Amino acid sequence: MSVASLPLRALNIATQGANILGTLLIVGLVVIICTDVLGRNLFDAPLSGVPEMISLSIVAIVFLQVPQALRAGRLTRSDGLIDSLHRSRPRLASGMELLFDLLGCLVVSAIIYAHWPILIKSITRNEFVGAVGNFTMPTWPAKLMILIGATLLALQFIARIIQRLKKGHIQ
């Protein structure tokens, strides 16, 4: 293994770890929702805070899992145009792929830049969701997961850009 591939390997391991964490959150939500449904129907006692937990977790799950989707080439997109361009005009298609990665990195970087103060405010003000005395949950863990996922996504875009330029697809 070359020294140059170590950062990419570390990025891919971190990306896979975030994906696994997102999957574990999904499993946790399934357990919580099933427990809530059983509690409502069998004991007329719903589980407190389920809507709050779900609303915070869904966004965190998306941000934790989208870097792996990009890495695996499974990010949702329309391939019809780009596939036909790869056959007829490969340089143009490669340029469009590079442009997609650059714009993706730019947009995700803007999200990171805008989200950082939101995370800091959430931590310093001890923000929470729910009703005091019934159920409260801090918001910062979900916001931290969003920041981690967005950072991994930006780094995956950068890795794709570097790989495209190394392969010489753009001349």
Q: Can you say where each PLM-predicted feature lies in the sequence?
A:
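Alpha-helical transmembrane segments and membrane-interface helix-loop junctions
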Residues: 1-171
